[in-house]
């Protein structure tokens, strides 16, 4: 790690963007060259966030169109869906590595993408992006120039589900995912639905069976099970906390499989993981993961015969977004996977 790579963060003023910048500041391999946004050009990040000290990030906000791509090795795109693909179309031949945190390159089937997100300006580039679920696609990520980081809900569902379907331990029908997310998952834009009086002391379900992470989850489960047309009952819920995500997953066991077998399979599958752990006590609370890149999975027998309940928690802004992006960056750079990701979080 004797050299540094020049990095640009596009969308640096959003929650995901500022978390990414915070992590990269502690990365010995990174030199932050550009921070880009669409507003407040020329300002410092400290003018957007009170907890950011003025001298800690001396790089001022730039307009993306004004940056010199020849001075950039890696670009992180922390943009709303539908904006990253326009940038990628212009720069994919000019930048060594692109790590996209939007949904623009997650969905491999263009018709499915259009159904959920609308038109895509460079569908021919979708297959060039590796789906950045780190522990599943580690080898592919290492060899790739382009990575599409998973959504937060998708991460919390797929980390436990992918190995279980691949190993044929649970049925691919009747999968139910009930997920709760902190409000930061809805982004930083001004919206009446996110005002304090609208969310305080309130739990709200939204986009039931219509959330855009559904096709992403179903796509990866089809890949895992080597079959087509796996559908998931997915209910996202907004809870009145800043950050954190907890997913409760309800599954039917294959014949002869017990919850003990499920737990053992997950232990073996993730035995070498630096961030994913099987721990029932820590899995049931977001307190275990806030401010970290960790993911805890708990396995519990269902009251209904031949069923199992799995609980999975992550920090939606870290393992669900910026943390996983840095983890993927580390793999692509052939440096220690945990670099810049082991800082002790606040109490």
Swiss-Prot record:
| Any GO BP | L-arginine biosynthetic process
Q: Which residues does the Swiss-Prot or TrEMBL record annotate as the active site?
A: 152
Q: Which InterPro entries match?
A: AGPR_AS, AGPR_type-1, NAD(P)-bd_dom_sf, NAGSA_dehydrogenase, Semialdehyde_DH_NAD-bd
- What EC number(s) does this enzyme carry? 1.2.1.38
Pathway annotation: Amino-acid biosynthesis; L-arginine biosynthesis; N(2)-acetyl-L-ornithine from L-glutamate: step 3/4
What does the entry list under GO cellular component? cytoplasm
Subcellular compartments? Cytoplasm
- Matches recorded under SUPFAM superfamilies: Glyceraldehyde-3-phosphate dehydrogenase-like, C-terminal domain, NAD(P)-binding Rossmann-fold domains
EC top class, in one word? oxidoreductase
Q: Which UniProt keywords apply?
A: Amino-acid biosynthesis, Arginine biosynthesis, Cytoplasm, NADP, Oxidoreductase
Pfam family for this entry, one: Semialdhyde_dhC_1
Identify the PROSITE patterns for this entry. Answer: ARGC
Question: Catalytic activity, per the record?
Answer: N-acetyl-L-glutamate 5-semialdehyde + phosphate + NADP(+) = N-acetyl-L-glutamyl 5-phosphate + NADPH + H(+)
Q: Which GO terms describe its molecular function?
A: N-acetyl-gamma-glutamyl-phosphate reductase activity; NAD binding; NADP+ binding
Q: What HAMAP family is this protein classified in? A: ArgC_type1
Similarity comment: family membership: Belongs to the NAGSA dehydrogenase family. Type 1 subfamily.
Instruction: Give the protein's biological function.
Output: Catalyzes the NADPH-dependent reduction of N-acetyl-5-glutamyl phosphate to yield N-acetyl-L-glutamate 5-semialdehyde.
Q: What's this protein's name?
A: N-acetyl-gamma-glutamyl-phosphate reductase
Q: State the organism named in the record.
A: Ehrlichia ruminantium (strain Gardel)
């Amino acid at each position: 790690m004797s050299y540094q790579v020049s990095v640009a963060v596009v969308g640096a003023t959003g929650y995901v963007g500022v978390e990414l910048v915070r992590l990269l500041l502690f990365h010995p391999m990174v030199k932050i060259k550009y921070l880009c946004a669409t507003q407040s050009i020329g300002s410092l990040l400290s003018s957007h966030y009170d907890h950011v000290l003025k001298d800690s990030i001396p790089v001022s906000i730039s307009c993306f169109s004004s940056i010199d791509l020849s001075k950039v090795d890696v670009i992180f795109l922390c943009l709303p869906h539908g904006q990253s693909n326009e940038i990628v179309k212009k720069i994919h031949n000019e930048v060594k590595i692109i790590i996209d945190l939007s949904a623009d390159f997650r969905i491999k089937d263009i018709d499915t993408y259009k159904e959920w997100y609308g038109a895509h300006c460079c569908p021919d580039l979708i297959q060039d992006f590796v789906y950045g679920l780190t522990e599943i696609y580690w080898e592919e990520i290492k060899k790739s120039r382009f990575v599409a980081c998973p959504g937060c809900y998708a991460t919390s569902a797929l980390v436990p589900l992918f190995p279980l379907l691949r190993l044929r331990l649970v049925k691919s029908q009747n999968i139910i995912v009930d997920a709760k997310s902190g409000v930061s998952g809805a982004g930083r834009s001004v919206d009446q639905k996110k005002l304090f009086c609208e969310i305080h002391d309130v739990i709200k379900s939204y986009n039931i069976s219509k959330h855009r992470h559904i096709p992403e989850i179903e796509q990866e489960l089809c890949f895992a099970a080597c079959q087509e047309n796996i559908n998931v009952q997915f209910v996202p819920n907004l809870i009145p906390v800043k950050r954190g995500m907890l997913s409760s997953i309800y599954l039917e066991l294959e014949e002869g499989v017990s919850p003990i077998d499920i737990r053992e399979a997950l232990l073996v599958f993730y035995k070498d993981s630096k961030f994913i752990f099987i721990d029932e006590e820590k899995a049931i609370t977001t307190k275990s993961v806030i401010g970290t890149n960790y993911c805890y999975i708990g396995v519990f027998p269902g009251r209904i015969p031949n069923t199992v309940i799995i609980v999975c928690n992550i920090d939606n802004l870290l393992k669900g977004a910026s943390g996983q992006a840095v983890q993927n960056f580390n793999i692509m750079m052939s440096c220690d996977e945990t670099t810049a990701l082991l800082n002790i979080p606040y109490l």
